[in-house]
Structure formats: C-alpha cells, structure tokens
Regions:
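Pre-Walker A (Motif I) flank of P-loop NTPase domains
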Residues: 4-8, 124
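Hydrophobic anchor at the beta1->P-loop junction of P-loop NTPases
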Residues: 11
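P-loop (Walker A) phosphate-binding loop of NTP-binding proteins
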Residues: 14
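Conserved lysine of the Walker
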Residues: 19
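N-terminal phosphate/diphosphate-binding loop that engages ATP/GTP or pyrophosphate donors
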Residues: 29-93
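Small-molecule kinase domains that catalyze NTP-dependent phosphoryl transfer to phosphate-bearing small molecules
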Residues: 67, 118-124, 132-137, 141, ...
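ATP-dependent NMP and nucleoside kinases share a basic, alpha-helical "lid"
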Residues: 89-166
Length: 229
C-alpha cells in the first residue's frame, strides 16, 4: 500500500453513482476516516418525518431549525449512521426518505448544520467524504476532488438492487423517476447546487468494477502527489 499525506479527499456526484461505496473503500485502502454527508442529510430527513417537520407536500416547518440544535447524528462502528444510540442506517436508505431528502437538503439552515457537523467530524484531518457539494462548498480547498457519474439506468438499477437487498419491494420505474427528479432538484437549488468543481477529476463508473475504480484512484493519487507504488 502506498503512503499518502494527510489530505482531504472530496467525492461528489449524482445519487446512486456509488459514491459512498467508493469512498468507504478508498478510506479502507489508505487508512482514512470516512464521512458520509448524504447519510447526515438522510438522517435529518428521517428526523423531520418522525417529528412532523415536513409534510406530504414537501413543505418544511421552520421549527426544524431549532430542533436541529438537539439532534445527535454521528457515525458508529463500521461507518453506520446513528441517531443518538439508535442505528438508522437501514431506515435512511428507504424510498420514503429518498423521496424527501432533496427538499430537506435544499433548506439553507439544514445545509449549514450538516456542513458544521462535517467540519467537526473531520477536524482530525486525513478524511475522505462524499456528497453533492463537498468539493465546491463544504471543503473547497480539498487537496483531491473526484466527481462521479454514471448512466441513469445504471444508477437506478444500483438503487433498486440495494433496496431489494434490504428487504424492500421497489418498482424500477419509480426508482428511476425518483432519481431523475433528485438530479433536477439537486442541480437547480439556489444553495450549493450540484455541480462539478473546476479542479475535480471525473470518474464515470457505469461499466467499472470496484477494483477498477480503486486502481484508477491509486494511479491518480500517485500521479498527483508524485508517489511511488
């Protein structure tokens, strides 16, 4: 394994491009701390749903801002997302949460809360994190930025398979429609819209295995930082 300096690696991209899986494997391979910003947004969404801070029409209550002050979201053993002492990893990946995470993530004070949480968790340095605006907004000075993309149908199939594996009963057409709707909302919101940072390296993993993705990023790191394998 190559030794790399204590840097911040930002991984951005559309939903279901495999950002989390990729970032987790990069963290494992290079002994980095992994932070999943998307899980925090999903955790806030679940919290809002359970406490009636968002309705069926995706209208977010102003009371959520004050309620966030007492919300404890963190990552437990294995990188699972927890709300207090409760593991919510499976719940935040449900279709119900997926359908409302974009409206929640578009709220400026929610984005500020997540950003502050990420900076707190990343204070020790040597981290890799994934999301929609890590390299453009949260950590614009990250030493390495990667923007992940894949074909719509490939991304929808990944999400469909993930939901099936967790005991869900998804409909592929609904998953695909939800994915495209989220893409539109994420890229058109007024606060920190989804976009590729000018200095980000693009990774289209539509037809790549994880081993191929890791080989790609290792070559990128070696070339960018002048390291020998």
């Amino acid at each position: 394994m190559i030794e790399i300096p204590d840097i911040t690696i930002a991984v951005d991209g559309c939903s279901s491009t495999g950002k989390s899986s990729f970032a987790k494997e990069v963290a494992k391979k290079f002994n980095f701390l992994y932070l999943d910003s998307g899980a925090l947004y999903r955790g806030v969404t679940l919290f809002a749903q359970e406490n009636a801070y968002i309705d069926a029409g995706n209208v977010v209550s102003d009371d959520l801002e004050t309620a966030l002050e007492a919300l404890d979201l963190h990552f437990g053993e294995g990188g699972v997302c927890c709300m207090g002492d409760r593991c919510i990893e499976a719940e935040i990946r449900s279709m119900g949460v997926s359908s409302q995470v974009s409206p929640i993530a578009a709220v400026p004070y929610v984005r500020n809360w997540v950003d502050e949480r990420l900076h707190f968790l990343a204070a020790s340095g040597r981290v890799v994190m994934d999301g929609r605006d890590i390299g453009t907004s949260v950590f614009p000075n990250a030493e390495l930025k990667i923007y992940m993309t894949a074909r719509d149908e490939v991304r929808a199939q990944r999400r469909f398979d993930e939901m099936k594996a967790k005991g869900g009963n998804p409909v592929f057409e609904e998953v695909l429609a939800n994915l495209r709707e989220r893409d539109y909302i994420d890229s058109h919101r007024s606060t920190s819209p989804l976009r590729k940072a000018e200095d980000a390296f693009e990774l289209d993993n539509s037809d790549m295995t994880m081993a191929e993705e890791l080989s790609w990023v290792q070559g990128l790191i070696q070339g960018r930082f002048g390291l020998l394998g």
